[in-house]
Amino acid sequence: MKRGYIIITIISLLVFMSCNNSNNNRTYPEGEINFTIVETTDIHGMIFPYNFITDKEENTSMAQVSTYIKKLKDEGKTVLLLDNGDSLQGQPTVYYYNFVATNEPHIWSEVLNYMNYDAVGVGNHDVEAGHNVYDKIVKEIKAPLLSANLVDEKTKNPYFKPYTIIEKNGVKIAILSLIEPAIDRQLPKVLYEGLATEDMVESAKKWIKTIKEKESPDIVIGLFHAGANYTEDKETFKNENASQLVAEQVDGFDIILVGHDHQGWSGLGYDETTKQKTKEVKSPSGKVVPIFGGVNAARFIPSIDVSMIYTNNAWDIKFKGELIDVSKYEADKEFLDNFDSSKKAIQTWVSRDIGNLNTKLTSDDAMFGDSYFLSFIHKLEFTIAKEELGEDVDVSFAAPLSKDAVLNNGVVRVRDMFSLYPYENFFYVMKLTGKQIKDVMEYSYDRWFNTMTNINDHLIAFKKDANGELIFNNRYNSYDTVTPSYNYESVGGINYIVDVTKPRGEKVTIESFTDGRPFELDKEYKVAINSYRGSGGGGHLSQGAGIDLKTLQNMDLVLKATDKDLRYYIIDWFEKQNGAITVEKLNNWKVVPEDYVEAGKKKDYKLIYPNN
């Protein structure tokens, strides 16, 4: 993590030859103008320095951010305070106000207003909360809620404000916000009914032109809920992480603030050759565009001092920024006192007993093959499909949504459900052919497991740099895998074998259904699946099974869907059980050759879990 200062000087190329009449008559401020930009992003409900899931104190939260903001203001600095989205999913803090205490003002709205935010961007996980939540938030917060490329399907007009103009010390600041556009393959349509996303580069070109012609701002800030490393081919339409692509392909931005990737950016962009954050990013005209972005859960936040001098009909703009380690600041007592009643209400809710387990469940075993953890998820999906949707499904899909999940034996509480199932996914019963199911499995296991040529090879498919070396992720203190664990899709209801010595497309051998029925490639089956996967998330159904993305978005293959998230039904299931629950492993699949697997697991476990 780079924490040192980086100083970038930008000579603005705006000579204002095309400014409107009102701007020609404008009197510009004299001398050096200063203000400080602070961005929070991907807070994911970390409002208090306390983890409601683990029941442990934390050293970063919005309470510490509040202390830092007060410090800046006490120093006499003018602060431009921005949030970049993904706040409405994660901790039970926001879930409680999203779906339980819905008649009360949302705690996130209250926090934004308390801290006097200037503008707020929209993230994909904010959209995931659904219309009822974000339509309420936009009415409650004082700051404008922004997103230029989340548009009305019919009119193509932005659903939220596309940009805002803010004045600080006489400087006219334009803030254009964009959301990562891949939500149409990540989220069920019901969560953003009537809306669509536009490609970030295309949207930026359109709106930067409008802003320049209509507003004639002194400085333009991109507030993008998307990562800087484009991860796929840079020409990918609706690229999920196109922030740096916008900087490199669209003139007009002075600085870009990013989110979504949780990586932390301190001025420099991603160098695709070295795979490091070392690239000086330049616009098409050659202007340096610094990229800053925070780390999730308020761990690190960008703080950028801006100095501007208007001379010779142009602005000389300098940025001096760093990533602030929020853990070095105490929680703001006034902040905590103000929201104490909310914290107590959430604490009471998450501490509620809902059942008892005889079996300890951990997701680390699920990273390497059949496990008690995934067996439990599969059984829950079969049960929920039957009891809530009235469907006897043939197959279930499930993945370890977190590689670090632990559900201890003993009393089970509401908070434990956020470890077992961390995302607000809905639940579908879909119709898929046997071939499509098989293709999904091949796609999953090809990205999950390496193709082993000898017993010394890696079992897990790890990312590699240009030199063929594994890539260590300092933030997670482990080596990066080709795809996250939440894409490690396994299957219930079928007996099958995964051979890691076989090439792509030939790893999976399906023997039969677990009830003895033959599995037929040309026959249609009912499949239990979460809404992320069913909407195209991870590419299993689109790239793996070759199903058109629009078909998935329109839910054409969905027979039935829940109207609440899976976690709600899992909590309900626990509360209906009598006595302690013993989980049995399904034992319906295995990875071979066993000696290769055992050797690979022993080696790779240390790379994924170096602290265990």
PLM feature spans:
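Sec-dependent signal peptide recognition
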Residues: 2-10
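Residue-level detector of alpha-helical recognition elements and their boundaries
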Residues: 8, 135, 271, 452-456, ...
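Intrinsically disordered, low-complexity regions enriched in Ser/Pro/Gly/Gln/His and often acidic
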Residues: 9-12, 582
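C-terminal motif of bacterial Sec signal peptides marking the signal peptidase cleavage site
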Residues: 15-18
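Acidic, metal/ion-coordinating pockets
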Residues: 20-324, 328, 373, 377-380, ...
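Catalytic centers of hydrolytic enzymes
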Residues: 26-36, 45-55, 59-74, 186-201, ...
